[in-house]
């Protein structure tokens, strides 16, 4: 149990509303700001809060958990995250980042990469030896299926491609929807729609989207992926298998504290889900843990206790399902749903 933050006074300055990147290291339930010249340096024994305020109130709040950080420190970080999220009107999408398994969005804040250093504030020493990870700001999605079509992130390589599916290569300012010669029309439409959704919701409509057919790859694709080899043949029967796998890889749970404890009730055990299942009065867990990620959706009319317990619910769910501790968590306020989240639902409105 962690001591709540006093109602009077805030440990965060008014500048948390300012655009740009804000980083704090957690020290004894207090956020200590990190100087700009030290952005990108993370100590394995510590936990951090990373806030990015983008245009049009598009804020993202990340909890970064060092591999050697203590449970107490992680809990304190969660308490501060709840306070900061409330201070910002619960606008931010929240993410839990585990050292070595950070999301592409998190990595994009640090174009020079991350530097991991040993030690932490609790251990009273900070070694200067560091290891740098490259900035992973490029993504590749495979779009596959006939009925339950799903985009799944793949390794950034021609080895991930085949002639029977569509792929989205997201390079930030340019988004390529590449369609194999044997891909079906539904996959092609899905790839186009998802590329446009990424442009509109994640790039504020400022990225360029290009539809590419097999054999007409632009120079930028070749520069990123290397010379194009002969690609694997696609198999239409795999689309049927993918439909079954995609449907079974996700489940939807309702969160309730009616009994005084947080309880989960499964409301759908396969996707695509009906969007009407997401009731504004409640919070929900979308379980895609078999693919390494779970989502918490917070209805705008859900009670304060349920909304503030989202991180706690996520941690408990990961433990209960025996998922990897590296499982990524994304907490979405109603109205801030990402294109990847929306693809689990039919007829999203």
UniProtKB/Swiss-Prot annotation:
A motif (Nuclear localization signal) lies at residues 138-147. Pfam families: Gelsolin. It is found in: Nucleus; Cytoplasm; Melanosome; Cell projection, Lamellipodium. Its main location: nucleus. The modification Phosphoserine is found at residue 338. Phosphorylated. The modification N-acetylmethionine is found at residue 1. GO terms for molecular function: actin filament binding; phosphatidylinositol-4,5-bisphosphate binding; protein domain specific binding; protein-containing complex binding. SUPFAM superfamilies: Actin depolymerizing proteins (SSF55753). Gelsolin-like repeats lie at residues 28-107, 147-222, 264-342. InterPro entries: ADF-H/Gelsolin-like_dom_sf, Gelsolin-like_dom, Villin/Gelsolin. GO terms for biological process: actin filament severing; actin polymerization or depolymerization; barbed-end actin filament capping; cell projection assembly; cellular response to type II interferon; central nervous system development. Keywords: Acetylation, Actin capping, Actin-binding, Cell projection, Cytoplasm, Nucleus, Phosphoprotein, Repeat. One of its GO terms (cellular component) is mitotic spindle. Interacts with NUP62. Interacts with NUTF2 and RAN; involved in CAPG nuclear import. Calcium-sensitive protein which reversibly blocks the barbed ends of actin filaments but does not sever preformed actin filaments. May play an important role in macrophage function. May play a role in regulating cytoplasmic and/or nuclear structures through potential interactions with actin. May bind DNA. Uncapping occurs either when Ca(2+) falls or when the concentration of polyphosphoinositide rises, both at low and high Ca(2+). Belongs to the villin/gelsolin family. This is Macrophage-capping protein. It comes from Rattus norvegicus. The lineage of its organism: Eukaryota, Metazoa, Chordata, Craniata, Vertebrata. The gene is Capg.
């Amino acid at each position: 149990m962690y001591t709540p933050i006093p109602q009077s006074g805030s440990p965060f300055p008014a500048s948390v509303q300012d655009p740009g990147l804000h980083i704090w290291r957690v020290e004894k339930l207090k956020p200590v700001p990190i100087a700009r010249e030290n952005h990108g340096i993370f100590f394995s024994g510590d936990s951090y809060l990373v806030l990015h305020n983008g245009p049009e109130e598009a804020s993202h709040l990340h909890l970064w958990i060092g591999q050697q950080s203590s449970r107490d420190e992680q809990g304190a970080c969660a308490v501060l995250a709840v306070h900061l999220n409330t201070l910002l009107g619960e606008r931010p999408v929240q993410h839990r980042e585990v050292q070595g398994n950070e999301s592409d969005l998190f990595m994009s804040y640090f174009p020079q990469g991350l530097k991991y250093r040993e030690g932490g504030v609790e251990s009273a020493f900070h070694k200067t030896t560091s290891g740098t990870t490259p900035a992973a700001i490029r993504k590749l999605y495979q779009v596959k299926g006939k009925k339950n079509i799903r985009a799944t992130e793949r390794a950034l390589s021609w080895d991930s491609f085949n002639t029977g599916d569509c792929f989205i290569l997201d390079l930030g300012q340019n988004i390529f929807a590449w369609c194999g010669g044997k891909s079906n029309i539904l996959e092609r439409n899905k790839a186009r729609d998802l590329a446009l959704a990424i442009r509109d919701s994640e790039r504020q409509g400022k990225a360029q989207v290009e539809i590419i057919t097999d054999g007409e790859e632009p120079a930028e694709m070749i520069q990123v992926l290397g010379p194009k080899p002969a690609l694997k043949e696609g198999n239409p029967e795999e689309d049927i298998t993918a439909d079954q796998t995609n449907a079974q890889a996700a489940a939807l749970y309702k969160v309730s504290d009616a009994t005084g404890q947080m309880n989960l009730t499964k409301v759908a055990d396969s996707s695509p889900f009906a969007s009407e299942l997401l009731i504004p009065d409640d919070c929900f867990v979308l379980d895609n843990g078999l693919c390494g990620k779970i989502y918490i959706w917070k209805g705008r009319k859900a009670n304060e206790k349920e909304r503030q317990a989202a991180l706690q619910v996520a941690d408990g769910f990961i433990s209960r399902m025996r998922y990897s501790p590296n499982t990524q968590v994304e907490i979405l306020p109603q109205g801030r749903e990402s294109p990847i989240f929306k693809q689990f639902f039919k007829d999203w409105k």
